[in-house]
Amino acid sequence: MASKLFVPILDNGTGIIKAQYVYSALTALTGRGIALARFSQPYPTRIMNMATATFLSSDCDEMLIIDCDINFTRADVDKLLSHDVPLVYGLYPKKALPLQWCVATLTDENPFGGDEPLVEVKRAGRGFMRVHRSVFEKMKPLVPEYHNHGRAEWQFWHEGCDNDGEWRSEDWWFCDNWRKLGGKVLVDQTICLQHIGDYSYGATIPNNS
């Protein structure tokens, strides 16, 4: 039986969603029988914890997170959903030149360019990711629980300084907690997306094998 998919529509509290995202979403998600919910909140940690709590209270098995400034295709979504792993990401660059992927690698060596689509990294940006319910269930003992208007929520997404004085964003923090549990942070290097700002930042990875 196919997994039930939850897709939160996230904006940054302004109500503005990039036109490229709307077109991508309509093209890639139409006809899939997914559960959709929109969230509007200016704080990244708040919106992600709200979306995750809604997902966990649903009967869906997996959550597909796509930021509202990502340009993607149906094929990108198909690839992400095809992997039998609990957590997987697509690649997109930061909104800056020269282009840099929104990932932190395990070593200083470039891990990309080989034949295998899945590459393990240390951390990845959450702008295009698929996560199974089991990831959050395993992570609950590591994070605080709180209540919001009578509903239980968990601080899966947090930002701040760690014990080494390094500032970590909410997606970095999430990856670190998953790796503490022995999980792998995997990216599909064949999914190379555009990050929409004043310019559409995008690139592809050449095969070096």
Q: Whereabouts are the PLM-identified features?
A:
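C-terminal catalytic/acceptor-binding lobe
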Residues: 2, 6, 143-209
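Short beta-strand-to-loop acidic/aromatic patch adjacent to the donor-nucleotide binding site
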Residues: 59-71
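N-proximal low-complexity "stem/linker" segments adjacent to membrane-targeting elements
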Residues: 1-46
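Residue-level detector of anion-binding/catalytic polar loops
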Residues: 35, 69, 86, 184-186, ...
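Active-site nucleotide-sugar/metal-binding loop of Leloir-type enzymes
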Residues: 49-62
